[in-house]
């Protein structure tokens, strides 16, 4: 089994190459997608200003109040059904889901989160409608049909919750006992010193999170990759805008993170 995460940067630029490559893997894959840029577009049309939280360690996340959650659900619903419809045109039976559907992804709402304000001070703020994943029902994600999963979960109280897409992809990979987790974005892999790093161990990936050369979403990807690699899941960070991007990743392209070299 493999898990393919289609990052928001790919979704908002051109997801066609990934989608065209998916039929080859339809009987042994689960797809997870993002789409933050479309969320921002929907929010703008609703007159809502996107807000972000910076956490200790430098990780950044979207602040999700109720109005933001509504925009998030709308955007992710569109992306999800766009992917499913595109796969249908290629002869692939696909089922688009959020984590709330069939209760496939459960999460606990983060009531409070620790953030760093603009003055560099740490403080605790309301967590909004953001969840920490507690359970993935792997049996419901097994193909056929090919499952396409949006990064939304459901709480025990029936709340829809925004969950991090990379974290969701990792939890799905762990749940379905995947051999490989392919994280597709708009870069060729992890760049250090201006060059793509072809291979890393889990330990090396963890150490690089603290590097000033690793920023933004790549920090989170490396943290998830290190955790997955320790469980024996090979993680590949690769370019989803390339020709046959899944083939390319599985055949040595991008940055490969494993437990040991």
From Swiss-Prot:
Q: Which UniProt keywords apply?
A: Amino-acid biosynthesis, Arginine biosynthesis, ATP-binding, Cytoplasm, Kinase, Lysine biosynthesis, Nucleotide-binding, Transferase
Coarsely, its chief localization is cytoplasm
Q: Which CDD domains match?
A: AAK_NAGK-UC
Q: Which GO terms describe its cellular component?
A: cytoplasm
Protein origin, superkingdom: Archaea
Subcellular location, record wording: Cytoplasm
Residues flagged as site, Transition state stabilizer: 5, 221
Q: Give the family from UniProt.
A: Belongs to the acetylglutamate kinase family. LysZ subfamily.
Which named protein is this?
Answer: Putative [LysW]-aminoadipate/[LysW]-glutamate kinase
Q: From which lineage does this chain's organism come?
A: Archaea, Thermoproteota, Thermoprotei, Thermoproteales, Thermoproteaceae
